[in-house]
């Protein structure tokens, strides 16, 4: 992500509420209708069927929630499908509830999705029958600590109160992997607080926790709030020394920087990134998967108005979802897009 794009983030983020309210249905618990699986023409069709479709997103102050609401609006406005987006705990929970047919589309970190299809981590012993619509933008692992905590590296988490994200979230997955890579036991060495982002930010402000791990796009509204409120009292932690150990677990992890302009910090912050993917069940019709995938890229400009992370949507990298297989309908759409 370029620095110039980051500098426009605050203005772009200001449009989130206006563009997503009609698409966000709050927390939901429903059984998926036939829209996701229903046929819509022949094998070469790329037209969505009529019906209802729901999208599992993430915490209300995170990028999944913002883009999920925008995606729901785009789907409803341009197809016969009526889409809603729901606030959730994010990646692990999203995949579990996608498989249980409570949602039809799910945002997920690529490392969590890889665990799901290979039966590892939270999915030990039971693989999830899901496919990818596309690889989308990348999540930045944002480790923020109070300066008075004395934390300068993940090894310093020992004995500290650290928010590791919502239960069953992708943030919790990578937080625990970071702690383990630092030679610590998440259950014994760290006072892990399993908080959503809103509660995490509040806890940082009132001093009831020493630091946080968050995995999200740039900028994340909750982190912007924290940095604006606490300014020089907080700082990012460089986690890149742990990257080799993380890559031993999953090669999807890579190094990048959080540009200083993102949150108004004194300097760029080195960190670890992981791609995001949009997932569906394998039983989604080829026509629906094709139509939805094509729509994401055709309406990229509309999604950019919701959140600048959508600027990273690229058909050239969208197929890179291994080990999660692309849905056949999505493959057709991406082949057509070139």
Task: Identify the role of each PLM range.
Residues 25-28:
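Bacterial signal peptide processing site
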Residues 34-56:
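N-terminal low-complexity, Pro/Thr/Ser-rich intrinsically disordered segments
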Residues 50-78, 82-83, 138-206, 316, ...:
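Bilobed "Venus flytrap"/periplasmic-binding protein-like clamshell domains
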Residues 19-23:
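C-terminal motif of bacterial Sec signal peptides marking the signal peptidase cleavage site
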Residues 269-271, 275-338:
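Segments of small-molecule ligand-sensing domains
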Residues 67-74, 84-126, 143, 151, ...:
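Pocket-flanking alpha-helical
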Residues 110-112, 119-123, 149, 186-278:
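Pocket-lining segment of extracytoplasmic ligand-binding domains
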Residues 1-11:
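Bacterial N-terminal signal peptides that target proteins for export
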